[in-house]
Amino acid sequence: LFLFLFAIQTVITVSAQKVQTPDQVYGQLFKDVQLSRIFPDNKTFVDCTPKRKPAAIVADYLKIKNNPAIRFSLKLFVEENFTMPPAPPAFNYIQKEKDVAAHINNLWSVLKREKDKAVEGSSLLPLPHPYIVPGGRFREIYYWDSYFTMLGLKESGETATIKHMLDNFKFLIEKYGHIPNGN
């Protein structure tokens, strides 16, 4: 049994798609953006999508960043070459329920995200089924949080949503060889 499981894991790992991370794609540009703190957190730039081919953006960056004839602004360069991630949906859910269970049941629709669309150059790993995010400011699923989310969904009778989330995990394993912390 152990050898069989090992063989299956080996096949999954070998056939898994390799995806370059933003630091691999953007190299020095990524490092400079993250260290300059032009964004309030380290996640914003990771979630930006390029307006053109990443290799062209990096080549332009390396060419002009230290050019003394150009008054270079890293923030302006990023704004011109990347689309900022959309703001999370407004969390306008304020109702007085009679009990905590009713409140939680009503939050599922606020925290639910529909299946993702692939965007070239985005770090988002698109998921084929709807899922629940761990809170209002989040745009993606998180592996560890999903366990506790599914426990809550089970208590609420949301079995279809649990199935979608498990199908997303299956998809991630088949495509990437593992379930990353976030998609």
Task: Cite the ranges covered by each PLM segment.
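Bacterial N-terminal signal peptides
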Residues: 2-10
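Acidic, mature catalytic/reactive cores of soluble proteins
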Residues: 16-183
